[in-house]
From Swiss-Prot:
Residues 38-41 are annotated as: Interaction with substrate tRNA. This is tRNA dimethylallyltransferase 2. ATP binds at residues 13-20. Keywords: ATP-binding, Magnesium, Nucleotide-binding, Transferase, tRNA processing. PANTHER family: TRNA DIMETHYLALLYLTRANSFERASE (PTHR11088:SF60). Substrate binds at residues 15-20.
Length: 300
């Protein structure tokens, strides 16, 4: 593969912005499959709650890395990096341009910049931390993480106990801050990368997100969540749309409140996505409808 001869187009943006429709048009223009960069669409049990491409959309354009794993499977951004790069080797033998699309920031960075190899934690450290969490909750673990790795503490979702524990177990096992393993220099890639960002005004995006959640409920999100409810302890299910439904199934909130929380948490997630993406000066930003023609000219 020669850098100047092959291009990876990356279509990114917050949840609900309209990536799916435009991605189909771009992929048809390129004549190549779509690579999904969604860390939850990869799980076959979650098509509704992750807004995975429909069978009709997949018949129109083949999609890779959608529904390929079970929620029971361990999967990471590092594994995704390796597998996508292998897939691109094959795809670039047939196509000059390939589209990667999604909103999972770590997955996009994994392909475009690369991820450091992070050592496995000592099993006894992990066991001790999970025992502490079960006995005392997360406050003490958070305090220790803040002391040992203030950078990671500042950006981690402190309600996500698995991510908090993972950060601390790496600190304790290696004697280094977890954040020190995060790559600052991008790996070289043997292809061009063109990043296309989609945006909408905040009010417009929030309305679209709220409407999409209601549409998901009509499509059967509640039933989909019930089917995986016995597996709620899995990290793949610690995600917006499912954890709120699980609270409803537990009886701690009613159905209407669960829907409201999914809408609210989806809006919060969209804001976090935009904060992350805005750090990347290589992204060119477009409105998915008003600038559609301009975007399509970029891939010709």
């Amino acid at each position: 593969m020669e850098t100047q001869d092959h291009t990876l187009y990356v279509l990114l943006g917050p949840t609900g912005v309209g990536k799916t429709d435009l991605s189909l048009d771009i992929a048809e223009r390129l004549g190549s499959p779509i690579i999904s960069a969604d860390s939850r669409q990869i799980f076959r049990e979650l098509p509704i709650g992750t807004a995975a491409p429909t069978p009709e959309q997949r018949a129109r354009v083949p999609h890779l890395f959608v529904g390929t794993h079970s929620v029971r499977d361990y999967y990471s951004a590092g594994m995704y990096e390796v597998e996508v790069l292998e897939a691109l080797k094959e795809l670039f033998r047939k196509y000059r341009g390939v589209l990667l699309t999604g909103g999972s920031m770590m997955y996009i960075d994994a392909v475009c910049r690369g991820i450091d190899d992070i050592p496995d934690p000592f099993p006894e450290v992990r066991e001790e931390l999970y025992a502490r969490y079960a006995a005392e909750g997360l406050d003490g673990i958070l305090a220790q993480l803040r002391l040992l790795d203030p950078d990671y503490y500042a950006k981690v979702d402190r309600r996500n106990y698995k991510r908090v524990i993972h950060g601390l177990e790496i600190c304790l096992s290696t004697g280094r801050p977890f954040s020190s393993f995060h790559r600052h220099e991008a790996k070289e890639r043997p292809f061009r990368i063109v990043k296309i960002g989609l945006y909408r005004e905040r009010e417009e995006l929030c309305k679209r997100i709220d409407a999409r959640v209601l549409e998901m409920m009509e499509q059967g999100l509640e039933e989909e969540a019930r089917a995986v409810y016995p597996l709620r302890h899995l990290n793949a299910l610690n995600t917006v749309g499912y954890k709120e439904m699980f609270e409803y199934f537990d009886g701690s909130i009613d159905r209407a409140e669960a829907v409201r929380r999914i809408q609210r948490n989806s809006r919060v997630y969209a804001r976090k996505q935009m904060t992350w993406f805005r750090r990347d000066s290589t992204i060119r930003w477009f409105h998915p409808e008003a600038d559609k023609g301009t975007v399509l000219t970029l891939v010709t």
